[in-house]
Design a protein with these regions (language model features):
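Short loop/helix-cap segments at secondary-structure boundaries that form the rim of catalytic
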Residues: 40-44, 139-140, 218-225
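Short catalytic/ligand-binding loop motif for oxyanion handling, primarily in non-cytosolic enzymes
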Residues: 37-40, 57-59, 116-119, 176-179, ...
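SAM-dependent nucleic-acid methyltransferase catalytic core
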Residues: 1-23, 68-183, 244
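Long, positively charged, glycine-interspersed low-complexity recognition regions
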Residues: 188-252
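Short, polar loop motifs at secondary-structure junctions
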Residues: 32-36, 132-135, 213-217
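Conserved S-adenosyl-L-methionine
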Residues: 10, 16-82
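Short active-site oxyanion
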Residues: 23-27, 46-47, 142-146, 203-209
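Short His-Asn-centered micro-motif
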Residues: 29-33, 51-52, 148-151, 170-172, ...
């Protein structure tokens, strides 16, 4: 199952995650965005409770799963009206439209048209918005995927408050030291992650937690007590840190 959204962070380590989280498991997954990871796990028999604390993301997915054809029609109607100047205006303003289906359609258009895969930022890249994108939108049909809107801005608090499941998954993506972030405004489609706080939570949690990260040297020390599995740029398992592209980290 291929998601209709462009991934802001694309993962090659889903096979590793599938080995850690068995089929028929119930999973709370956080940082839900493109659905790349969650849809793949749902399509192979895992019940995915896909959490986001950004309403715009939740709203898009609810419209997609409720009636993908209606969403495709709305996107096809509005897309020709968006010129270059309006694209950059909408990056800051699309959430202010009153019509929910229009907002969801704009989310899809802006995501596919953004060089970053983020609706709120990136350069205009029209090559990614083509007939194939509409085809993916119309074809997307997956069971066992349930979007959940978390109202707390604190990611870790939302994890603690979630309904009890055996597994918790976080496709985090890129690591940072969270420098100079205090007081910065938050985009409508970006969830802040405080990586050291997350590591502390993982170390103390009774839940089985799986993290997906792009390679970063700091992670080897931060998670030295945990199970770290590496894959290369082609998704193949490797023990060579020099060839490591992604890291899957588990506290079990």
């Amino acid at each position: 199952v291929k998601t209709p959204l462009k991934s802001n962070v694309s993962f090659r380590s889903v096979t590793t995650v599938k080995k850690l989280i068995p089929t028929n498991s119930k999973v709370n997954s956080f940082l839900f965005y493109s659905g790349e990871v969650e849809a793949s796990l749902a399509a192979t028999g895992r019940q995915m409770m896909a959490h986001t604390n950004r309403y715009a993301i939740y709203e898009f997915w609810m419209h997609l799963l409720a009636d993908r054809h209606a969403l495709a029609r709305a996107a096809a109607h509005v897309h020709p009206t968006i010129d270059d100047a309006q694209f950059y205006f909408l990056q800051e303003d699309w959430t202010n439209y009153k019509d929910a289906k229009l907002r969801a359609a704009l989310f899809f258009i802006m995501n596919r048209s953004s060089s970053t895969g983020l609706v709120s930022c990136g350069e205009l890249s029209r090559d990614n918005f083509n007939p194939a994108a509409f085809a993916l939108l119309k074809r997307f049909d997956v069971e066992n995927l349930y979007p959940v809107y978390d109202k707390d801005d604190d990611l870790i608090q939302n994890i603690k408050d979630a309904s009890d499941t055996e597994y918790t998954l976080l496709p985090v993506g890129n690591y940072s030291f969270n420098l100079f972030e205090y007081g910065k405004s938050r985009a409508a489609d970006v969830t802040p992650v405080h990586h050291r706080d997350l590591a502390e939570f993982v170390g103390q949690s009774d839940q089985k937690v799986v993290l997906m990260y792009k390679n970063h040297p700091a992670l080897f020390d931060l998670y030295k007590e945990h199970n770290i599995q590496m894959v290369d740029a082609y998704g193949r398992p490797t023990d060579d840190r020099g060839r490591c592209e992604e890291m899957t980290i588990a506290n079990f």
